[in-house]
Amino acid sequence: MNNYQLTINEVIDIINTNTEINKLVAKKENLFPTDLYDLDKQELIAIILNSDFALSSIKRVLLEVTVEELGTQDNDEDDELEDLDGEIDRVDYIDKDGIRFDVPRETSPHVDKSIVTFNDELLDEANKIAKSIQEHDFNDKAIEEAELKIFKNHLPSIYSMKKENK
């Protein structure tokens, strides 16, 4: 099974192409949709991970990519016929253990978070950071880890600022 890595721009594209997510995120954060591009990485991760609706839509996009890659997605002609018959449109979903599920397309089955990364970081790890920030669980170890990650993310920009000031 492949590892699916989402870049910030891919996540923003998912948000921007889904008007419901876009409205939800923009309304919650009092932002215009284009402001999402200006957010700090940690802020964007926290917004997305704390929005069940955004997460389920991202999971659905990942699932559709997985299904397309495996070649098991129904083609559009069949979809139209199934819809006319009143049958529920179904797709095959294969989990990490190779077990095949036949699930309705409208649902979003569980996507194994262990295969999904966000900026080369496991989704579970990013989720822990967002939850600790949200719950104000500021113990010393969590603060050190967060500061180290933020420092590593901003190191290139600090270096370029020093060069400009010389």
Swiss-Prot record:
GO terms for biological process: DNA replication; viral DNA genome replication. InterPro entries: Phage_Gp17. The keyword Ribosomal protein does not apply. Keywords: DNA replication, Early protein, Viral DNA replication. Induction: Expressed in the early phase of the viral replicative cycle. The C2 promoter controls protein p17 transcription and is strongly inhibited by the viral histone-like protein p6, probably because of the formation of a p6-DNA nucleoprotein complex at the right end of the viral genome. Thus, protein p17 is synthesized very early after infection, and its synthesis declines later on due to the inhibition of the C2 promoter by protein p6. Pfam families: Phage_Gp17 (PF17549). Homodimer. Interacts with the histone-like protein p6; this interaction optimizes the binding of protein p6 at the viral DNA ends, thus favoring the initiation of replication. Involved in the replication of viral DNA. It is required at the very beginning of the virus amplification, conditions in which a low number of viral DNA molecules enter the host cell, possibly to recruit the limiting amount of initiation factors at the replication origins. Once the infection process is established and the other replication proteins reach optimal concentration, it becomes dispensable. Optimizes the binding of protein p6 at the viral DNA ends, thus favoring the initiation of replication. Belongs to the phi29likevirus protein p56 family. This is DNA replication protein 17. It comes from Bacillus phage phi29. The lineage of its organism: Viruses, Duplodnaviria, Heunggongvirae, Uroviricota, Caudoviricetes.
